[in-house]
């Protein structure tokens, strides 16, 4: 295919690069800001790169239970991811491949609930969680997020790919439902598994709202909530806040970069052919 | 894993159903007993693993939780909670049968956290705060009465009816045990004023009282010399008492009537004050503070970006001392300017309350702990000094001998105005305050309309809370 | 005979299916459905710290009369109406620019535009707060040093700018997913159609509108749905940046709900808002999903 490079292309490309710069900037600023001294962080004109990097902010950050926060985030995201993956792949498979009573209704309810922002059930959810005695624990975030039906929806999409003939052949061979699921279904939906896992992990990590409402104790905060708290306590000290923000952002960005193909796939599968 | 979890959950749910889905009283008690029964051990264990921080308490010990706003000053560079931990260590040494767990909270998200925790039944036992919120919790029946702590000796020692009344709810019982108090005031930067040749505008004699005319003169000089005035901060409710006192003082208005039964800010003086402030902001003498809250306004002041601030107290002075020195700024505290030169100041009262968590032993232990913090021979005065303000107990005397600045702050107590922070619906009123200022500053409505609207809504909030 | 056998099979399938669905339904019913029902029920009560009193539909009546609620509804709609077209065009532009590049470049740009989403609202807001700061912020400094403005502008506190300032952050934190979707679906446009059209002498614009755009329609509709829902939920930006100010200019329904629940302690009222918000979102997504559904089965 022949392509001539016109002025328009160059302008568009330049525009694209400027936009990229704006999108990278916050992350870049957090990373570099974490190593700047307090005075430098609010300096104008800004110091575009830390000329005299310092670890001072991290020392101050460590006087807070920042590592505990980080661990809480990892724990919450990890467990949520596990439960969501198992539960959703089972449900997604039958929704895609079985014909049963109530199927259509059930699926519509799931789809409707998916569109519902969880914030609207905030107060009752909090009441419920406290009835169970798990308010202000990691489970107060994990369990409600496991109820969110996006995973079911996504896994249904992936399960549509399972050839029906294969399932029927298995049935004729006398394979039980559980075996069919583990030996035929699972291998086929594996990419979906990866996509859902990473998707859940990232979304849970950044689910500020749930964390804000469900967690109180300083030792139980997640890293994002911890940073928001720091922002309020240390409003004067940008350096420490940046160090905290870096601690919240770097791990999750790293995870994203490592698994971005799965992630992209998850997003695409969850959407097209809806 | 999943199975255990589901079991635990199911059990927890059962417990819930059995306890009945009735009033909120039930919610606080369900959690604890459920964890004791064998069936729900899984849920209990899960919760503990998640937290992972519960240290084992000695057998038979009462465990209480203390939530503290950053009211005690910390030693330089120490994180929130360091001093509090020292108090706890000293208390636990004397009372080995009580274990105190500390949580530090901040002023921005703290109040909402407390609300959430009250709803969820996970609120602390002891809270260190001020009457505004504490009395509203009392009015909602969430607190333990502290009448037995207000002994005749204590009441006589405090000898200040207004202050004692601020610790009472409308049922006549005491719910807050006060430790220290001080007036809110404002502060100017000596460096800026000197550079703008405006030192003559302020009064450094006596109680440093001054008039609105002098204040306006100072604004003009600062502006001419290129300094920014303070922000009329109103992005949120943090620190709003400072700017509210500023508004009421400049033309001698009052937030409420003397009986604290009705809002009266829409009197002539209040409207005039808001009109004047709008004028000042439009002329660039003061900054439109719709993007700043009280804390951020103080940040700008101590960073040297603004020449004065309308939110200052001895506590803030000590918390920000280090930054001020770094930026080579000397802050001079002043009362608010007023038309007649006699300020009417709002004041803070620091004190403790005890939440009713349905456990008498905890309530007793909490009271003991509060008593220790306020009345221990060694720690009482020390704690007062850490709040950087003045003891409510007259018998403690002058805790800041020879400190001229503190002497000035102490002199302001005679200008205390009626304390309205315990008015019903106070919390709701605060949510109307800053939008009102924003409406005025951004020209959405005239000062008169805005303040009338505010007073209507605020008065409605009193009715709502009945 | 045949019918009953069929029913038997179907019955069996149903049993098995529900066994597989059980865990998902368990979580869903307890943590989504039950709170939803509780929310609807309590929205009929005057429900605060003191207790509950049944007041029928009063909360709803008051809500529609509540000026602040009306303002938040308008703000929310402005955010939706503002973010949806910009997001679509922006995403389309980036995707069109990058989908034919080599895989490395493509995934580079994909990552770049997804970065703010992954970084998380809290961390990103820390930086934006500084960008918008009237006195120390970089935006005012930049504009002043380029002589575009003379006086500092109070981005998040000025009634003319506040909502737009929020909108910009909202877009940067939500455009990542649409870009990924567009890149994927542009890659799916059959090459032969495009080439055939080019042979027929169609220019780039014609190729785009007549060949590519129709096959992008389902994706576009889906993007419209998710961006709409996303904008309806805008909360943390407001909570972290403006507290709804100035004078309720950035209060969204979601933020107002939060304020009512946690600052005014009016849980019943907050729940009523939640119900209405859910209905609005439900209705909008229903319409959009319908449209999507009919278009997709090609």
Enumerate the language-model features and the residues they cover:
Chain B
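Ligand-binding pocket segment of bilobal, Venus flytrap-like solute-binding proteins
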Residues: 218-220, 266-325, 353, 368-374, ...
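Hinge/lid segment of periplasmic solute-binding proteins
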Residues: 45-53, 57-58, 106, 130-185, ...
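Long, aromatic- and glycine/proline-rich binding clefts that accommodate carbohydrate-like moieties
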Residues: 331-334, 382-435, 439, 464-465
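Extracytoplasmic "Venus flytrap"/periplasmic binding protein-like
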Residues: 93-159, 173, 195-197, 201, ...
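Helix-loop-helix "hinge/cap" segment bordering the ligand-binding cleft or interdomain interface
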Residues: 93, 150-154, 168-239, 253-291, ...
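Extracytoplasmic/periplasmic substrate-recognition and gating elements
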Residues: 62, 93, 99, 283, ...
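C-terminal motif of bacterial Sec signal peptides marking the signal peptidase cleavage site
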Residues: 16-20
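Conserved N-terminal structural module of periplasmic/extracytoplasmic solute-binding proteins
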Residues: 21-139, 155, 340, 361, ...
């Amino acid at each position: 295919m022949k392509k001539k490079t016109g002025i328009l292309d160059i302008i568009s490309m330049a525009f694209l690069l400027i936009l990229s710069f704006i999108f990278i900037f916050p992350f870049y600023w957090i990373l570099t800001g974490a190593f700047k001294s307090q005075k430098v962080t609010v300096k104008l004109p800004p110091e575009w790169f830390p000329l005299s990097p310092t670890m001072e902010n991290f020392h101050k950050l460590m006087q807070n239970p920042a590592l505990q926060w980080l661990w809480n985030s990892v724990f919450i995201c990890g467990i949520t991811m596990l439960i969501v993956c198992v539960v959703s792949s089972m449900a997604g498979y039958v929704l895609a491949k079985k014909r049963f009573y109530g199927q259509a209704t059930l699926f519509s309810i799931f789809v409707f609930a998916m569109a519902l922002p969880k914030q609207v059930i905030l107060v009752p959810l909090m009441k419920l969680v406290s009835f169970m005695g798990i308010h202000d624990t990691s489970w107060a975030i994990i369990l409600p997020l496991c109820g969110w039906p996006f995973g079911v929806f996504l896994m249904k999409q992936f399960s549509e790919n399972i050839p029906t003939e294969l399932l029927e052949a298995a049935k004729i061979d006398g394979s039980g439902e559980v075996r069919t699921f583990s030996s035929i279904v699972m291998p086929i939906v594996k990419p979906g598994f990866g996509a859902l896992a990473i998707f859940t992990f990232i979304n849970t990590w950044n689910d500020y709202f749930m964390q804000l409402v469900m967690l109180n104790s300083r030792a139980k905060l997640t890293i994002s909530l911890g940073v928001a708290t720091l922002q309020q306590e240390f409003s004067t000290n940008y350096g420490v806040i940046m160090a905290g923000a870096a601690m919240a952002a770097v791990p999750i960005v790293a995870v994203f970069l490592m698994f971005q193909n799965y992630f992209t796939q998850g997003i695409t599968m969850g959407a097209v052919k809806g | 894993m999943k199975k255990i979890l589901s079991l635990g959950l199911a059990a927890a749910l059962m417990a819930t159903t059995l306890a009945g889905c009735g009033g909120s009283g039930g919610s606080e008690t369900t959690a604890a007993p459920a964890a004791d029964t064998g069936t729900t051990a899984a849920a209990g264990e899960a919760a503990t693993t998640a937290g992972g921080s519960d240290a084992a308490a000695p057998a038979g010990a009462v465990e209480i939780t203390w939530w503290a706003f950053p009211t005690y000053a910390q030693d330089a560079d120490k994180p929130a909670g360091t001093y509090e931990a020292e108090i706890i260590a000293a208390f636990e040494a004397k009372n080995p049968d009580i274990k105190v767990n500390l949580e530090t909270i901040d002023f921005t998200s703290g109040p909402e956290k407390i609300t959430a925790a009250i709803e969820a039944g996970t609120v602390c036992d002891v809270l260190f705060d001020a009457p505004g919120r504490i009395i509203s919790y009392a009015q909602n029946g969430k607190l333990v009465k502290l009448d037995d702590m207000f002994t005749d000796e204590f009441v006589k020692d405090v000898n200040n009816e207004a202050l004692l009344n601020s610790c009472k709810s409308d049922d006549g019982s005491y719910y807050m045990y006060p430790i220290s108090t001080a007036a809110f005031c404002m502060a100017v930067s000596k460096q800026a004023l000197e550079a703008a040749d405006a030192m003559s505008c302020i009064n450094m004699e006596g109680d440093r009282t001054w008039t609105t005319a002098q204040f306006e003169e100072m604004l003009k000089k600062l502006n001419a010399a290129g300094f920014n005035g303070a922000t009329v901060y109103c992005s949120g409710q943090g620190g709003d008492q400072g700017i509210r006192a500023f508004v009421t003082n400049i033309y001698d208005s009052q937030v409420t009537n003397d009986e604290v039964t009705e809002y009266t800010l829409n009197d002539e003086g209040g409207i005039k004050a808001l009109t004047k402030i709008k004028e000042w902001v439009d002329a660039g003498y003061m900054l439109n503070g719709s993007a700043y809250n009280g804390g951020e306004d103080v940040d700008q002041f101590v960073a040297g970006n603004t020449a004065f601030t309308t939110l200052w107290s001895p506590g803030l002075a000590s918390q920000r001392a280090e930054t001020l020195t770094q930026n080579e700024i000397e802050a001079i505290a002043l009362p608010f300017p007023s038309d007649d030169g006699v300020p009417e100041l709002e004041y803070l009262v620091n004190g403790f309350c005890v939440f009713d968590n349905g456990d008498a032993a905890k309530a007793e232990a909490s009271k003991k702990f509060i008593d220790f913090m306020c009345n221990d021979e060694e720690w009482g005065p020390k704690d007062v000094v850490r709040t950087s303000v003045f003891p409510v107990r007259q018998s403690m005397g002058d805790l800041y001998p020879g400190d001229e600045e503190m002497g000035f702050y102490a002199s302001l107590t005679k200008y205390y105005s009626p304390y309205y922070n315990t008015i019903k619906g106070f919390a709701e009123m605060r949510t109307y305050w800053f939008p009102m200022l924003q409406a005025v500053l951004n020209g959405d409505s005239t000062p008169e309309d805005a303040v009338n609207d505010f007073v209507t809504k605020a008065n409605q909030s009193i009715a709502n809370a009945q | 005979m045949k019918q009953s056998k069929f029913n038997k099979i179907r019955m069996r399938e149903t049993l098995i299916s529900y066994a597989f669905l059980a865990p998902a339904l368990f979580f869903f019913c307890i943590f989504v459905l039950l709170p939803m029902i509780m929310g609807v029920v309590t929205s009929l009560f005057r429900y605060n710290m003191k207790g509950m009193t049944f007041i029928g539909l009063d909360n709803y009546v008051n809500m529609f009369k509540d000026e602040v609620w009306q303002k938040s509804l308008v703000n929310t709609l402005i955010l939706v109406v503002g973010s949806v077209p910009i997001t679509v065009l922006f995403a389309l532009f980036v995707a069109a620019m990058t989908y034919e590049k080599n895989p490395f470049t493509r995934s580079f740009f994909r990552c770049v535009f997804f970065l703010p989403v992954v970084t998380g609202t809290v961390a990103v807001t820390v930086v934006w707060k500084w960008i918008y700061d009237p006195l120390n912020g970089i935006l005012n400094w930049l504009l002043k040093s380029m002589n575009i403005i003379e006086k500092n502008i109070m981005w998040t506190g000025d009634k003319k700018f506040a909502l737009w300032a929020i909108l910009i952050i909202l877009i940067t934190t939500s455009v990542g997913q649409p870009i990924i979707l567009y890149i994927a679906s542009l890659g799916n446009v059959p090459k032969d159609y495009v080439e055939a059209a080019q042979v027929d002498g169609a220019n780039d614009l014609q190729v785009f509108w007549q060949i590519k755009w129709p096959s992008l329609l389902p994706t576009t509709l889906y993007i419209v749905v998710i961006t709409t829902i996303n904008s309806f939920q805008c909360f943390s930006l407001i909570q972290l940046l403006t507290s709804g100010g100035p004078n309720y200019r950035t209060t969204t329904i979601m933020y107002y709900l939060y304020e009512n629940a946690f600052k005014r302690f009016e849980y019943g009222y907050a729940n009523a808002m939640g119900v209405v918000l859910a209905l609005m979102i439900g209705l909008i997504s229903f319409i959009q999903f319908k449209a999507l559904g009919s278009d997709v089965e090609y």
